[in-house]
A protein has these predicted regions:
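Solvent-exposed, polar/charged alpha-helical surfaces in well-ordered, non-transmembrane soluble domains
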Residues: 5, 9, 87-94, 98, ...
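Surface-exposed acidic, glycine-flexible loop patches that form ligand/cofactor-binding
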Residues: 53-62, 94-100, 179-183
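Conserved SGNH/GDSL esterase-like catalytic core that processes O-acyl groups on lipids
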Residues: 1-87, 113-123, 159
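Loop/turn elements at helix/coil->beta-strand transitions in domains of secreted/extracellular proteins
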Residues: 11-16, 62-65, 100-105, 136-141
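A beta-strand-loop signature enriched in Asp, Gly, Thr, and Trp
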Residues: 75-96, 100-107
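Short, surface-exposed, polar/charged, turn-prone segments marking secondary-structure boundaries
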Residues: 2, 44-46, 94-96, 133-137, ...
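Extracellular serine-dependent O-acyl
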Residues: 104-109, 117-155, 164-183
């Protein structure tokens, strides 16, 4: 019951999920302000997180769309660096584009943040979208999930509950159907 799996099933799409609790785009949960060596972009090329010499073969799977939900862990605790956050989004966009030249890339803001912290990751994502479009890449987007209010319960350590995952999937399904023209 994760929103990526529910979304893929509903859209009859293949999916690959790269996820780990606490991982960030530049700084893992409660990590140093200067970032972590094992944040997702730095280990994205691995088949297994803890094994450096077994690399993922990006040529074997070219998705139509790549959804990126990172940033919550980076800004969930103080201190974090907004400039490093922005640079990490930009650099990860370039990595994704180099691996998946034809895919649409959608940066997601998840359900856990509100206020300034949410605004900081949205600003960073918007900067990537703006820069990409200025350079002619019109296949980069931002989509915001609605905020988790608690009325659907919580999973472990404030992660989304099963019901929140279903809500997130419903939002993403509708968005991707429109974006990808999948009806």
């Amino acid at each position: 019951y994760t929103y990526p799996a529910l979304t893929a099933r509903a859209l009859k799409a293949q999916h690959v999920v790269v996820a780990r609790s606490g991982i960030g785009i530049y700084r893992n949960y409660n990590g140093p302000k200067t970032g972590n060596a094992d944040c997702l972009p730095r280990i994205y090329d691995r088949t297994l997180f803890g094994v450096e010499d077994v690399k993922w073969d990006f040529a074997q799977y070219q998705p139509d769309v790549v959804c990126v939900n990172l940033g919550t862990n980076d800004v969930s605790t103080d201190p974090y660096d907004k400039t490093m956050l922005e640079n990490a989004y930009r650099d990860f966009y370039y990595t994704l584009r180099s691996k998946y030249p034809e895919a649409k890339i959608v940066f997601l803001s998840g359900c856990a943040l509100v206020g300034n912290r949410l605004e900081h990751i949205q600003y960073a994502m918007d900067g990537v979208v703006r820069q990409a479009r200025l350079k002619g890449d019109t296949n980069v987007y931002r989509f915001d999930m609605s905020h988790q209010t608690g009325d659907l319960g919580y999973g472990a350590k404030w992660h989304p509950s099963k019901w929140q995952q279903e809500k997130m999937a419903g939002e993403l399904i509708a968005y991707l159907r429109g974006l990808m023209k999948w009806f």
